[in-house]
């Protein structure tokens, strides 16, 4: 694993990237 400068926004896939801010990852989709 590496540290990537990008993150997933609301409604975006989070199976490969973590979610931005403090969102949660549900069913591989970021949710507020």
From Swiss-Prot:
GO MF term set: toxin activity
Positions bearing 4-hydroxyproline: 5
Comment text on domains: The presence of a 'disulfide through disulfide knot' structurally defines this protein as a knottin.
Protein name: Conotoxin pr6d
Further remark: Authors confirmed the assignment of this toxin to the M superfamily by cDNA sequencing.
Species the sequence originates in: Conus parius (Cone snail)
Alphabetical keyword list: Disulfide bond, Hydroxylation, Knottin, Secreted, Toxin
Record flagged with keyword Flavoprotein: no
Compartment list: Secreted
Tissues in which the UniProt entry reports expression: Expressed by the venom duct.
Coiled coil: none
Cellular component aspect of the GO annotation: extracellular region
């Amino acid at each position: 694993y590496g540290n990537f400068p990008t993150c997933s926004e609301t409604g975006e896939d989070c199976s490969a990237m973590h979610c931005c801010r403090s969102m949660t990852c549900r069913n591989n989709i970021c949710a507020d």
